[in-house]
Amino acid sequence: MENVPNVYFNPVFIEPTFKHSLLSVYKHRLIVLFEVFVVFILIYVFFRSELNMFFMPKRKIPDPIDRLRRANLACEDDKLMIYGLPWITTQTSALSINSKPIVYKDCAKLLRSINGSQPVSLNDVLRR
């Protein structure tokens, strides 16, 4: 065998001679404030509607059925009639889904079964 010279590597450590002044918060307050400002602007741009909904008072949406609560049902022969609607001053015929007047044999007996001898309001019928 041949004589092969051995080579040994020794680690060399170089000590840093500069300080990490970029990481100091005190010297770069304006940069930090600018970043915070940019973050708030981005939050406002992307979440503007959510922020408006959070800080604005909730609007009360009127229930369309509230206008019908004062209307009452009555029978005229075998026809079911509605009176007391806010937009109609006269008594009108109650209509079914297919827009035909509701005609029921023993209509008065049906209304008595709902509310006894008291007048039957639309609210009584809608709650059932």
Curated annotation (Swiss-Prot):
Inducing or repressing factors: Expressed in the late phase of the viral replicative cycle.
Post-translational modification: Most cysteines are linked by disulfide bonds. They are created by the viral disulfide bond formation pathway, a poxvirus-specific redox pathway that operates on the cytoplasmic side of the MV membranes. Unglycosylated because produced in viral factories instead of the classic ER -Golgi route.
Transmembrane listed as a keyword: yes
GO cellular component annotations of the record: membrane; viral envelope; virion membrane
GO BP, one annotated term: symbiont entry into host cell
Residues that span the membrane, as ranges: 31-51
Location, primary (coarse class): virion
Virion surface topology ranges: 52-128
Protein origin, superkingdom: Viruses
Disulfide partners: C75-C107
Compartments where located: Virion membrane
The keyword Zinc is assigned to this record: no
Keywords recorded for this protein, A-Z: Disulfide bond, Fusion of virus membrane with host cell membrane, Fusion of virus membrane with host membrane, Late protein, Membrane, Signal-anchor, Transmembrane, Transmembrane helix, Viral envelope protein, Viral penetration into host cytoplasm, Virion, Virus entry into host cell
Intravirion side: 1-30
Record membrane topology: Single-pass type III membrane protein
Pfam families: Pox_L5
Family membership: Belongs to the orthopoxvirus OPG099 family.
Quaternary structure (record): Interacts with OPG086. Component of the entry fusion complex (EFC) composed of OPG053, OPG076, OPG086, OPG094, OPG095, OPG099, OPG107, OPG143, OPG104J5, OPG147 and OPG155. Except for OPG095 and OPG053, each of the EFC proteins is required for assembly or stability of the complex.
Function of the protein: Component of the entry fusion complex (EFC), which consists of 11 proteins. During cell infection, this complex mediates entry of the virion core into the host cytoplasm by a two-step mechanism consisting of lipid mixing of the viral and cellular membranes and subsequent pore formation.
Protein's name according to its UniProt entry: Entry-fusion complex protein OPG094
Originating organism: Monkeypox virus
Gene name as annotated: OPG099
